[in-house]
Amino acid sequence: MRTVLIVEDSETCAETLQIALDSIPGLKTIVLASPGAALTALHKHGDDIVAVITDLHLPLHDGLELIRQLRADTRFRNLPVLLISGDSDPQLAHRALARGADAFFSKPYSPAAVRRKLEQLLC
């Protein structure tokens, strides 16, 4: 089954995304709280993972570092990555996209907008 990793240390934010995405037919979500856990899951189940949605501020490494590591690995270079942040820095979206994010959402965001963008990227 196609799987989306949600890398988010806030249970509330993760649950909101899960509810929005779990209604997509043929798609399941896995929530992980850190980039390290996400990389482990990708190396273990990489063939099933079709996208990553990550928060910017996470334990140990941030979402931009996770994107850097994914883009440096030939297996995950083209994996869609959506970045979510609570920061209001107007340059952050530009930096995220320049570093390889496929989309950027600022909190508060619309879960439906995240879902639409994910569906667009997976077509």
Specify the residue positions occupied by each region the protein language model found.
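C-terminal output helix
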Residues: Y109-L118
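Active-site residues of response regulator receiver
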Residues: D55-L56, S85
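The feature encodes the CheY-like receiver
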Residues: P59, D89
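Two-component/phosphorelay signaling modules centered on CheY-like receiver
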Residues: E11-I30
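Conserved acidic carboxylate
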Residues: E8
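Acidic, metal-coordinating helix/loop segments flanking the phosphotransfer/catalytic sites
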Residues: V31-A51
